[in-house]
């Protein structure tokens, strides 16, 4: 969430009859979507270097429903918002949590995914509340993620117990190598990793201290037209049932749990 790669999802674009409105995309417009493809299952790189995942499939479905074109651009997490603000990308879709602070510098679509923060630990390690994090020598977070904000609020921003990393894969690797006592990150990403790596000896724990969060698609301040286009397309995808099909491809249905999600 580091080399830059492009992945295009050029979807069919047909001219709409009638007069244009704020939700219509120009005929030759290709929306550049900034994404840090180190956040499976939302975005990752396949063997050919193409961005894939839940966010990509959802955006592709939205583009088809809304008659616009998109192109995914993989880049480091810390460069996503600067790239949006300086015009290098038109949209950021990369598991971005909607926060009041971020709303000061960018616009957000309607929420498209609900998550919370969880604690990833070696199997058998007990964590009853966020207070237990204070007694750990090293708690890992990804810089700029909401896990970073949550742990910083709990322990203090400059607390040496907080170990910051550039991506989820790096931080999980450090935990597996014994360099961390725990990792705090987004629930869907951590649950997906534990489910797909049962031999790693990891488990995750949900805590009531961490509130529910929502992912949104970001656009530049003042670009209400793009936000309207995205919201209209997202609504169509939800109403058609396509959202549910994409969700089921990556995540367990409500009520289902993996062995780790006890």
Features from the language model and the residues they span:
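C-terminal motif of bacterial Sec signal peptides marking the signal peptidase cleavage site
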Residues: 12-15
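Extended ligand-binding regions for polar small-molecule ligands
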Residues: 17, 56-65, 143-145, 216-254
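Extracytoplasmic small-molecule ligand-binding "clamshell" domains
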Residues: 25-95
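Periplasmic-binding protein-like
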Residues: 37, 114-121, 187, 191, ...
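Bilobed "Venus flytrap"/periplasmic-binding protein-like clamshell domains
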Residues: 38, 51-61, 118-170, 182, ...
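Short helix-initiation/N-cap motifs at beta->coil->alpha
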Residues: 56, 72-83, 162-177, 213
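A ligand-binding cleft/hinge motif common to bilobed small-molecule-binding domains
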Residues: 96-104, 150-153, 176, 181-211
């Amino acid at each position: 969430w580091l080399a830059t790669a492009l992945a295009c999802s050029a979807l069919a674009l047909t001219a709409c009859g009638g007069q244009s409105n704020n939700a219509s995309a120009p005929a030759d417009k290709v929306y550049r979507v900034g994404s840090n493809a180190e956040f499976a299952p939302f975005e990752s790189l396949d063997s050919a270097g193409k961005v894939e995942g839940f966010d990509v499939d959802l955006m592709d479905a939205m583009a088809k429903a809304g008659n616009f074109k998109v192109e995914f651009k993989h880049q480091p997490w810390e460069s996503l918002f600067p790239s949006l603000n300086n015009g290098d990308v038109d949209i950021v879709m990369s598991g971005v949590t909607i926060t009041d602070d971020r709303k000061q510098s960018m616009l957000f679509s309607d929420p498209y995914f609900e998550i919370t923060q969880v604690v990833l630990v070696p199997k058998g390690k007990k964590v009853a509340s966020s207070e237990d994090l204070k007694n750990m020598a090293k708690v890992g977070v990804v810089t700029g993620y909401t896990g970073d904000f949550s742990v910083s609020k709990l322990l203090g921003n400059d607390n040496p117990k907080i170990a910051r990393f550039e991506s989820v894969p790096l931080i999980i690797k450090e935990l597996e190598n014994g360099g961390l006592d725990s990792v705090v990150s987004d629930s869907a990403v951590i649950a997906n990793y534990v489910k797909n790596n049962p031999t790693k000896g990891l488990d995750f724990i949900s805590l009531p201290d961490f509130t529910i969060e929502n992912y949104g698609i970001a656009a530049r301040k003042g670009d209400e037209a793009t936000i309207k286009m995205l919201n209209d397309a997202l609504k169509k995808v939800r109403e058609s049932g396509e959202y549910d099909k994409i969700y089921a491809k990556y995540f367990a249905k409500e009520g289902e749990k993996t062995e780790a999600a006890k």
